[in-house]
Amino acid sequence: MSQILTASQAEELHKSMVAYLSSIKASQSSNTLREELGIGDNFDEATCKKYEGLLEKKWTGIARLQRKILDLESKITSLQAELDSVPSMARSKQHQDPDNWLPAQSSAHTFESHRDAITSIAFHPVFTSLASGSEDCTIKIWDWELGELERTLKGHMRGVSGLDFGGQKGHTLLASCSGDLTIKLWDPSKDYANIRTLHGHDHSVSAVRFLTSTENLLVSASRDASIRIWDVSTGYCVRTITSNSIWFLDVSPSFDGKWLVAGGRDQAVTVWEVSSAEPRAALLGHDNDVQCCVFAPPASYEYLATLAGHKKAPLASSSSEFIATGSRDKTIKLWEARGRLIKTLVGHDNWIRGLVFHPSGKYLFSVSDDKTIRCWDLSQEGRLVKTISNAHGHFISCIRWAPPPRNAAAEASETTNGVSKKAPTKPAFQCVIATGSADSCVRVFK
């Protein structure tokens, strides 16, 4: 023992053993051990109390460390198997070719300032600004390249539930929604002044998205079972879509703003035509609430068409061919927009919270309450090709892709969150994603 422990460590261990025997009323054993170890009479009752429980704490601590070691060894084995499965030529190509980029295992930046869970994030379409909304009722603006907090926006009376940048070219606005029943518009060119507050929903507003970057139209989804379309230049609601859903949780527009897909608490997903405010398809198949939904970009059509059994991919100009949805049933489903289920992706261990397509169209990224980011390869029938475990310390609530680089300004003016409105075949894009979590942190992965 003396060769492993120092004298002071050995003394502490001996006294902890005597204290443990005393605490379980094994007086005879305790006294015998004291004599054997030469612990004198100065080890009185007060000193004994000091060492009570220490042995159990060390024992349980060792057990926790052993479990952690086993988890880490399992993760190392999994990562090594993943690495071994990729030929060296392919690995080097992945670093050179943005089309095959997957996020690193660890984040490039971690932003910490919020005092409650992160619910939503959004990238500025031109500048290196990233907005984050939280249950702490604030919005924070970060420089995601420098990793610095720029400002904090206050105005909502309840938690912020959704964010999006958009508006006409040259006049980008930030829209936010909240459990306080309002939508607020913030002007980055005026130090993010709150220039307008939109009223009309009768319950919590779950999500906001700009329809396109060339119009002043904004869509919102709410717990009041309605979807509203707003003219941000006037603040008026120009169209209301109602349904039997008890609570819309998410809404997403097609890249041309002609279609909407929305999901909610009734387990159903509905595709709506914006011009007529009429439903065009119902996507039925999830076994629990639908947390997120998104139209697939045209770049993914060739892969999704193959999954759907089609010999030919739809035209890139078509804006509403395929949809991805994520649910509390722990699955991701890929659909034809007309309502046919083509694939269910299984792998997450908890609610799916957010989805984003790789701009190349080859991959779909997902985040979940299981604290992972998962990357699904659509060119391999949706095979799970990468998992970033413990990407956050708590539930991951949202994910967004950075917009195109500044030198692609013409394209950037025609994008929303990295997806081109003009659907070019080879759009320029940045290999950057951001995630937000219930751990109150925002992380940027490169």
Swiss-Prot record:
Annotated localization: Cytoplasm, Cytoskeleton; Cytoplasm, Cytoskeleton, Spindle pole
Coiled-coil region: 60-86
Database matches in PROSITE patterns: WD_REPEATS_1 (PS00678), WD_REPEATS_2 (PS50082), WD_REPEATS_REGION (PS50294)
GO biological process entries: cell division; establishment of mitotic spindle orientation; microtubule sliding
Domain LisH positions: 9-41
Alphabetical list of CDD domains matching this protein: WD40
Keyword Cytoplasm: yes
GO molecular function: dynein complex binding
Keyword flag Cell cycle: yes
Keywords: Cell cycle, Cell division, Coiled coil, Cytoplasm, Cytoskeleton, Microtubule, Mitosis, Repeat, Transport, WD repeat
InterPro entries named in the record: Dynein_regulator_LIS1, G-protein_beta_WD-40_rep, LIS1_N, PAC1-like_LisH-like_dom, WD40/YVTN_repeat-like_dom_sf, WD40_repeat_CS, WD40_repeat_dom_sf, WD40_rpt
SMART domains: WD40 (SM00320)
GO CC annotation: cytoplasm; microtubule; microtubule associated complex; spindle pole
Ranges: WD repeats: 113-154, 156-196, 200-240, 243-282, 285-345, 347-386, 391-430, 432-446
Coarse class of the protein's main subcellular location: cytoplasm
Subunit structure: Self-associates. Interacts with nudE and dynein.
Family statement: Belongs to the WD repeat LIS1/nudF family.
Domain notes: Dimerization mediated by the LisH domain may be required to activate dynein.
Function: Positively regulates the activity of the minus-end directed microtubule motor protein dynein. May enhance dynein-mediated microtubule sliding by targeting dynein to the microtubule plus end. Required for nuclear migration during vegetative growth as well as development. Required for retrograde early endosome (EE) transport from the hyphal tip. Required for localization of dynein to the mitotic spindle poles. Recruits additional proteins to the dynein complex at SPBs.
Protein name: Nuclear distribution protein nudF
Protein's organism: Aspergillus terreus (strain NIH 2624 / FGSC A1156)
